[in-house]
A protein has these predicted regions:
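Conserved alpha-helix/loop element of class I SAM-dependent methyltransferases that forms part
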Residues: 26-55
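A short glycine-rich, Lys/Arg-flanked "PGG" loop and its adjoining helix->strand segment in the class I
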Residues: 139-154
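Conserved class I S-adenosyl-L-methionine
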Residues: 154-197
Length: 276
């Protein structure tokens, strides 16, 4: 059972971040491009998802909906987004109205997604970028994912690699081990958010969050225990945001380490299928 205090702190943080990200003063969220008709899904996501022509997609932890709406531009016929932040969902609905893209946005926690998103089941379930650190119960998470899928449907996971979650810059700006590979549900990592990954210098008022690290084995085994079949695992030396000062952003909007830095996986991708 999620500690209500942890959930409340995380929600307050993300409500505040949602307002900041929707304002998009730094351009990190590329809202102007979205409104101009762009597909904001990054190359890693596009390659993993493939053509979504005619398919229904549930996007979990959708935040302000920029990627959710981009799923239509990847070919999806029906899209539903879910996030626990009321402010994020309000902004997502506003973007849907402005773009004219008919996404359905629902507020709630991922564990309750099968009931919150209604009786219909989906061809695809998608989650990406900074999602799993907010989950304290992997089996409950994967059961929700499985319940959302139609028989034969697929789950697409794109997020920071478990190894990368362990890293932080040293005094020379190189990434070094700092955090545990895995944290128990009852002992999250308390994190005071003092820097915004969207490159804003604005100081948040609700800085305290609680996060969980999950090993690769724990993630994979939870998916298997939920009855899903792993079809593909991928590791990538690029990430949606910078986790160290020596990382630079390329024209594809992904951040990478310099050639002289030790090579480490930064993004993990998983494709899993529900039998049937």
């Amino acid at each position: 059972m999620t500690d209500p205090a942890h959930l409340a702190a995380n929600r307050a943080n993300w409500d505040e971040r949602a307002d900041l990200h929707f304002a998009d003063e730094t351009g990190f969220y590329r809202i102007a491009e979205l409104l101009a008709g762009a597909n904001l899904l990054l190359p890693i996501e596009r390659a993993e998802l493939g053509d979504l022509g005619g398919l229904s997609v549930a996007h979990l932890q959708c935040h302000i909906g920029t990627d959710t709406l981009s799923l239509f531009r990847q070919g999806a016929a029906e899209v539903a987004g879910l996030d626990f932040s009321a402010r994020a969902i309000a902004h997502a609905r506003r973007l849907a109205g402005t773009t004219g893209l008919p996404a359905r946005f629902v507020q709630g926690v991922v564990y309750d997604a099968p009931s919150l998103l209604g009786e219909a089941r989906f061809d695809r379930v998608f989650t990406s970028w900074g999602t799993l650190v907010w989950m304290d119960d992997l089996p409950r998470w994967t059961r929700a994912v499985s319940a959302l899928l139609k028989p034969g449907g697929r789950f697409h996971y794109v997020d920071c690699h478990p190894t990368a979650w362990m890293l932080a810059p040293d005094d020379h700006g190189n990434l070094a081990l700092r955090y545990d590979y895995e944290t128990p549900p009852e002992s999250p990592i308390p994190v005071e958010v003092t820097a915004n990954y969207n490159l804003s210098t604005r100081i948040l008022e609700n800085r305290q969050t609680f996060e969980w690290s999950h090993s690769l084995a724990a993630i994979v085994n939870a998916l298997l225990a939920a009855g899903l079949v792993i079809e593909h695992l991928g590791e990538h030396e690029a990430l949606q945001w910078a986790i160290g000062p020596r990382m630079t952003q390329d024209t594809d909007h992904l951040w990478r380490l310099p050639p002289d830095h030790v090579h480490v996986p930064l993004t993990l991708t998983i494709r899993a299928r529900k039998p049937g």
